[in-house]
């Protein structure tokens, strides 16, 4: 027996089912939320790999004690007199060198294909990059606090008071965040993590040591003092010293902030554009 199903005219002329379109646009609020989620991912990486905190925990303690007891007597005739010169310099040196890790870890993640997996997720593509930089701010804060604590243990008493120390710490963290955009660009465009680290250290070590972070700039040759006026780390060190020791707001602070804003304005778009081409 054959069953015949009648087809009504309405069914024959029914419009085909449409598949709803999904927008690829992600708003600013969602991008910010995704960035903080990726920053949290970066903090979880630190939790599961605590050895990555070596540079912001052991280094401030080791360098502060080492420089204080090795050079204190030679430069300032006593460790106590050397600490007002040393502690702000160590803070800048530790945090700025920590910013190099940003580029190195970005390159490692890209080599492992981590960002390739992010492409399949409904998140803002730039959130992986911005989240990594936000997570590093926690590292900068930890290094800053530890350096101050070690200095206090050694006998350093900042004449600028609590306010001067806090403002100096915030300035150093902000400036280092700005510098991290440079290393983010190097990390995204570099060919290997080792190469990124080598380039970064080759640039940062001379700039840090010639900035007067550990010795008075007045003892340097005239030509080196002249070069220092084009060294951004020099202004960071002087601004930190003036804030921590006198709570003074001078042109060094202005140049540090203006320079940091300029670095972000130039290198953040370049890093984002390079990342978007490769992510």
Residue ranges and their predicted role:
Residues 125-200, 248-272:
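Alpha-helical transmembrane segments and their short interhelical loops
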Residues 69-73, 184-230:
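Transmembrane helix segments
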